[in-house]
Amino acid sequence: NPPAVARIKYQAFYAAEKISQVDTPKTKKESWMDRLAGTQPADENAKPLFQLGEPYGMAVDSKGNLYVADQKVGAIFVFNTATREVELIKNKVHGHFVRIIGLAMDDNDRLFVSDPGLRHVLTFNAKHEPEDVITEGLVSPGGLALDVENRLLYVADIDQDQVLVYEADSLKLLRRIGTTGQNHALTTPGDFARPAGIAVDADGNLYVADTLNNRIEIFDGDGKFIRTFGKAGDGPGYFSRPKGVAIDSDDHIWVVDGMQDRVQVFNQDAQLLISFGGHGLLPGMFQGIAGITIDKTNRVFTSEIFPGRVQQFLYVTDAQADQLNKEKEAAREKKAGASNKDSSPAVPPSPLTQASAPTPK
């Protein structure tokens, strides 16, 4: 049989080592001594280089552009994944940032940005212009997720051990999930100890990476607890500080395991399907993995703090894999049939054929 189709394919990485986005103030004309000493740039219009420092939360807009929140640089990188061009949503230019962590994008390309340093969530329109600020109920907002169909914004509050639910248009606080005030000590199902990444599936169910409890908790769209899975450990299917969670179009649950620098993929029955990663800088390995997001085309993006990079993978869906396997099998059978035909011995003519053949003159 032909080998099965690879279900997760590495595609690219983003680091922006040579991106230049911020103008430097013009200085006096440099002398030959300045050039020799290296005290001034050779070009008055030269700009400093920027690269990802500590990328965390990510989001993808309707055009396929990738947004990456960088808490060290204090900016949001906007990568055109087709042309590899980069823009920045900058601190003190487009908005005021202290420590940006979480990102989420709605169907109108409105961007939500969590900043625990300022205890709020900012919103930007599609032109990257600031619009609104959410402060109600927030102490240390981190992970963000949007239920676009039901118009709900979920905000994981790390210090309060809660997930806050807002109406996505009016930005009104609707309810809280979890118990607060216990200093990250609660282990009961439905409560959290430093919740980090969150995600919403197609049915409106909420998934929460409960970091200190080393588990994933699942709630329905009304905030009612459904189930939990995961235990502390470093073996397959176990967690060591899960930080991020995402859902693909087949409803598989992708979990970023912080201390193990790996990604584990589960089905809805919490059965482990695949695990990949490990400590390292090679493609498909991670150093300080922090976040994960999956877009509508099943591109998977992971962020890493220590090398300052984002890696891009492609998840091949169940339907796509079935079709590709059928095509592979058909090609194999066609090749085998042609091979058998070429290798079959020549059939001698029958006596009837010999008798009816014209006699050469």
What are these regions (language model features)?
Residues N1-K361:
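Eukaryotic scaffold repeat domains enriched in small/polar residues
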